[in-house]
């Protein structure tokens, strides 16, 4: 999965997919009542990027729905996965459940079109704080209450705070999550970071007894870091330059080992070579 980083404006969806992304990451900020309000990152952000692009969340979901609904003029077949980077840092811990509830209602109405030929992309809810695990509970219970439990098949999870993996496993246990787990590791492109924790996450993924199904590394803009990530065995690379990642994937060392995921590849299944 080539994951376009910080895609917060509808026009950027097309831009990143054209460069080779089959997945995008979108920042979601919340208002004081725990309702998702904007797709917005703000400053500071990655070096070399405009941090201030934004949409209202509902408008972004409408644009995203069009880009992922077969038959729509804006449809882009390659775009199969969306990571919502949920900026819950502005919320009190006790608002996490409500944030999940509101997020589910928004996605149901504006992205899934109330279950009537909505967008088809898989969705990862990425939460920066383990204490906010109730966001997952609120999200799941709301979809069930609304009669759309089937849509949970399209939803996965990530805790993005670079926490210790046993702590992440215990947060999932509290949230009642047993699968559909992506694990991120990384840091802004302005700073270097080793692959130490990525390697631990991959070991958990491949152990057969861990909770992790997929591992992605962010933010990777250099060819050398891309190669290191592929050597380690990641499933996804988040980047500001999808064309760089696509380029490296076509190199002799990788083109037979890796391919770009399509809609038929289940993002919740651990890949077995």
Curated annotation (Swiss-Prot):
<feature type="active site" description="Nucleophile">
    <location>
        <position position="41"/>
    </location>
</feature>
<keyword id="KW-0964">Secreted</keyword>
<feature type="active site">
    <location>
        <position position="5"/>
    </location>
</feature>
<dbReference type="GO" id="GO:0016042">
    <property type="term" value="P:lipid catabolic process"/>
</dbReference>
<feature type="binding site">
    <location>
        <position position="25"/>
    </location>
    <ligand>
        <name>Mg(2+)</name>
    </ligand>
</feature>
<keyword id="KW-0443">Lipid metabolism</keyword>
<feature type="disulfide bond">
    <location>
        <begin position="47"/>
        <end position="190"/>
    </location>
</feature>
<dbReference type="GO" id="GO:0090729">
    <property type="term" value="F:toxin activity"/>
</dbReference>
<dbReference type="GO" id="GO:0046872">
    <property type="term" value="F:metal ion binding"/>
</dbReference>
<dbReference type="GO" id="GO:0008081">
    <property type="term" value="F:phosphoric diester hydrolase activity"/>
</dbReference>
<feature type="binding site">
    <location>
        <position position="85"/>
    </location>
    <ligand>
        <name>Mg(2+)</name>
    </ligand>
</feature>
<dbReference type="GO" id="GO:0005576">
    <property type="term" value="C:extracellular region"/>
</dbReference>
<keyword id="KW-0460">Magnesium</keyword>
<comment type="function">
    <text>Dermonecrotic toxins cleave the phosphodiester linkage between the phosphate and headgroup of certain phospholipids (sphingolipid and lysolipid substrates), forming an alcohol (often choline) and a cyclic phosphate. This toxin acts on sphingomyelin (SM). It may also act on ceramide phosphoethanolamine (CPE), lysophosphatidylcholine (LPC) and lysophosphatidylethanolamine (LPE), but not on lysophosphatidylserine (LPS), and lysophosphatidylglycerol (LPG). It acts by transphosphatidylation, releasing exclusively cyclic phosphate products as second products.</text>
</comment>
<keyword id="KW-1061">Dermonecrotic toxin</keyword>
<keyword id="KW-1015">Disulfide bond</keyword>
<feature type="disulfide bond">
    <location>
        <begin position="45"/>
        <end position="51"/>
    </location>
</feature>
<keyword id="KW-0442">Lipid degradation</keyword>
<dbReference type="GO" id="GO:0031640">
    <property type="term" value="P:killing of cells of another organism"/>
</dbReference>
<keyword id="KW-0456">Lyase</keyword>
<keyword id="KW-0354">Hemolysis</keyword>
<keyword id="KW-0204">Cytolysis</keyword>
<dbReference type="InterPro" id="IPR017946">
    <property type="entry name" value="PLC-like_Pdiesterase_TIM-brl"/>
</dbReference>
<dbReference type="Pfam" id="PF13653">
    <property type="entry name" value="GDPD_2"/>
</dbReference>
<comment type="similarity">
    <text>Belongs to the arthropod phospholipase D family. Class II subfamily.</text>
</comment>
<keyword id="KW-0479">Metal-binding</keyword>
<feature type="binding site">
    <location>
        <position position="27"/>
    </location>
    <ligand>
        <name>Mg(2+)</name>
    </ligand>
</feature>
<keyword id="KW-0800">Toxin</keyword>
<protein>
    <recommendedName>
        <fullName>Dermonecrotic toxin LamSicTox-alphaIC1</fullName>
        <ecNumber>4.6.1.-</ecNumber>
    </recommendedName>
</protein>
<dbReference type="GO" id="GO:0016829">
    <property type="term" value="F:lyase activity"/>
</dbReference>
């Amino acid at each position: 999965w080539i994951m376009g980083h910080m895609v917060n404006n509808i026009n950027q969806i097309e831009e990143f997919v054209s460069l080779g992304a089959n997945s995008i990451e979108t920042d979601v900020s919340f208002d004081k009542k725990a309702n998702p309000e904007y797709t917005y990152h703000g400053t500071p952000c990655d070096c070399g990027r405009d941090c201030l692009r934004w949409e209202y969340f509902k408008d972004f979901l409408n644009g995203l729905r069009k880009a992922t609904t077969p038959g729509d003029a804006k449809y882009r077949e390659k775009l199969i996965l969306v990571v919502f980077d949920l900026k819950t840092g502005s919320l009190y811990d006790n608002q996490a459940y409500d944030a999940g509830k509101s997020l589910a209602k928004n996605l149901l109405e504006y992205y899934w079109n109330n279950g009537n030929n909505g967008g088809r992309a898989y969705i990862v809810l990425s939460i920066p704080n383990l204490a906010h695990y109730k966001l997952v509970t609120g999200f799941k219970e709301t979809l069930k209450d609304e009669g759309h439990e089937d849509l949970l098949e399209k939803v996965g999870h990530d805790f993005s705070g670079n926490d210790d993996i046993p702590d992440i496993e215990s947060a999932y246990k509290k949230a009642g999550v047993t699968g559909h787990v992506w694990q991120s590791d990384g840091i802004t492109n302005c700073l270097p970071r080793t692959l130490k924790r990525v390697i631990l996450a991959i070991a958990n993924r491949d152990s057969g007894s861990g909770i992790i199904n997929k591992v992605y590394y962010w933010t990777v803009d250099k060819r050398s870091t891309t190669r290191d990530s592929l050597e380690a065995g990641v499933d996804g690379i988040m980047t500001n330059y999808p064309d760089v990642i696509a380029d490296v994937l076509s190199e002799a060392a990788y083109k037979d080992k890796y391919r770009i995921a399509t809609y038929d590849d289940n993002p919740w299944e651990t890949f077995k070579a």
